[in-house]
Regions:
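Short acidic/polar active-site loop segments enriched in Thr and Asp
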Residues: 33, 67, 98
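Non-catalytic positions within long, well-ordered alpha-helices that form the structural scaffold/packing
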Residues: 28, 62, 89-93
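N-terminal catalytic cores of NTP/NDP-binding nucleotidyl/phosphoryl-transfer enzymes
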Residues: 1-57
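Class I S-adenosyl-L-methionine
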Residues: 24, 58-62, 162-165, 200
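Active-site cores that bind ATP or allylic diphosphates and position pyrophosphate for catalysis
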Residues: 71-377
Length: 377
């Protein structure tokens, strides 16, 4: 048995530990096996910055019970839920997982099936009509399929179901009832589990430390904590220097959106003002946050189109006695796992190296992209 986890661990907290413990219990009750995780590194699916770098978060995941953590490349990390799920599942399927465990508000496989069957009957005309009315795809899916925008874990869970059904039907789903706060909740409440958002927003609140391990608290305090606002000056500079013509080449900038982005950047004085001023009914704040990251990292439409053929991925951390999994996967699958960059492998990661340097510029740390795999006893 090999259980997969798709995660951001931004940061890893008691709710994530609960999920990992559930996976460990299942493995122990079924004769043994491994937990393999694929994790976003520098930025997240909602267009947010990782609070600390990927190596710190991956090492924490291994200490919490994962056997290996593979880095999800930038272009999949900051993607729509379907593309995020598709690439993550491709990596995990090739890593030999038999099961995928995840937290969700609704654990009923029948619910996923019902939504999937509805989606098969939706015509392009229905989508186009709602797009003409100015709705974004998330809202359209909410209207047509009943997917609720305010339960992002369920939306991702459905994306996992859909992509596994299509590309890796041998993988069995292990949905676990999500406990505690919703993902988007920012305030600190008296709950067993806090949301990652609440922890990031209240990281200096002593109550928050109850939801983190001692190692994670030490690492966070030793690091420069990054927030989206830290990148505002670079984003604004990039928008103004690219101009409207240059913005057209950036991935996901379509339908004249470059004009709105450029005009709002000229007057915005902080990151949140920029996001709020660009977003509309058609363009959600999350979509705008992702686009701003693509502008920051100069991610073009060509970059995105080329990326999804990528078959080489980095391993950030692993248990010392499980490192042999890397060789097993490389010998038996269609992907290659790289524990350290060298002259032969660095060419596969040109875009991610650029992303890491932008992140490190604000984190004020060395080029952590070139660190070796972290092995933990």
């Amino acid at each position: 048995m090999r259980i997969g986890i798709i995660a951001e661990f931004n940061p890893l907290h008691s709710g994530h530990k609960y999920l990992i413990d559930q996976a460990k219990n299942i493995i122990e009750n079924n004769g043994g096996g491994e937990i393999v995780c694929v994790m976003s590194e520098f930025f997240t699916q909602r267009g947010e910055v990782a609070i600390v770098d990927g190596y710190i978060r991956a090492a924490e995941a291994v200490r919490a019970g994962c056997d290996m953590v593979i880095a999800l490349p930038y272009l999949a990390s900051v993607a729509y839920s379907d593309d995020f799920a598709k690439k993550s599942i491709e990596i995990l399927s090739n890593s030999g997982i038999t099961h995928l465990i995840f937290g969700t508000e609704d654990t009923s496989i029948e619910t996923f099936e019902e939504i999937y069957n509805k989606q098969q009957n939706i015509t392009e005309e229905q989508y186009r009509e709602l797009l003409k009315q100015g709705y974004n795809f998330a809202t359209i899916n909410s209207k047509i399929l009943g997917l609720q925008n305010d339960v992002p874990n369920f939306i991702l869970a459905y994306s996992y179901y859909k992509n596994i059904r299509k590309y890796a039907p041998h993988i069995k789903l292990l949905p676990i009832k999500r406990e505690g706060q919703g993902l988007n909740k920012e305030e600190v409440e008296d709950k067993q589990f806090l949301s990652a958002t609440a922890i990031r927003k209240n990281i200096n609140n002593s109550v928050v430390t109850n939801y983190l391990s001692k190692e994670m608290i030490v690492n966070i305090r030793a690091s420069k904590i990054l927030l989206e606002e830290d990148f505002f000056d670079l984003i604004k500079y990039k928008i103004l220097s690219l101009g409207k013509a240059g913005l057209k080449n950036i991935y996901d900038v379509n339908e004249g959106l470059e004009n709105r982005i450029y005009d709002m950047a000229n007057i915005a004085t902080d990151y949140q003002e920029l996001v709020n001023s660009i977003s509309t009914k058609r363009y959600s704040k999350k979509k705008i946050q992702r686009i701003l990251l693509h502008i920051l990292t100069n991610t073009t439409k060509a970059d995105y189109n080329e990326f999804f053929g990528t078959k080489v991925f980095r391993v950030l951390a692993a248990k010392e006695d499980k490192a042999s999994i890397i060789r097993e996967i490389n010998n038996q699958s269609n992907i290659t796992l790289v524990p350290v960059l060298n002259s032969k492998t660095s060419g596969y990661f040109v875009h991610d190296i650029k992303v890491s340097r932008i992140y490190n510029l604000k984190a004020q740390q060395e080029d952590i992209f070139r660190k070796n795999i972290i092995l933990i006893k």
